[in-house]
Amino acid sequence: MEKKTIVARAEVLPGKEQEFISKAEPLIQGTRAEEGNISYNLYQNPSNPTAFIFYEEYKDQNAISVHAESAHFQAFGKAIEGLLASELVIESF
C-alpha cells in the first residue's frame, strides 16, 4: 500500500471565510475518524484570507474512494454551494 496525498485548493468569496470554516468543521472531524485517513487539515492563507487548502493524507487509493463517498464529504459539497469564488482545484500526489 502506498500513501496518497491530496491538496484541495478553495477560493472563497470575500466575507464568507468564517462560514466556510464552520461548514468545513464536520467534514474535518468526520474525515479524521475514517479508518484510512492519516491526516486532514484545513489551512487559510494569512496574506490572502479567501484562499484555503485542505491537506489530506490517506493510507491508499481505496481510502480516498471511501472518503469521496462518505456522508460528511457529500454534505460539505452541498453546504458550501454559494461560498466559493471558483471551483475547487484538487491535486493528487
Map each language-model feature to its residues.
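Short, structured helix-loop boundary elements
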Residues: 17, 21, 51, 70-73, ...
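N-terminal first-folded block
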Residues: 4-26, 30
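Short, flexible segments with low predicted structural confidence
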Residues: 2-4, 18-19, 35-37, 52
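Glycine-rich beta-strand-turn "strand-cap" elements at beta-sheet edges
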Residues: 2-5, 42-50, 78-93
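Short, well-ordered beta-strand segments in beta-rich or mixed alpha/beta enzyme
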Residues: 4-11, 41-68
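An amphipathic, aromatic/His-enriched active-site/gating alpha helix that lines ligand/cofactor pockets
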Residues: 26-38, 57-91
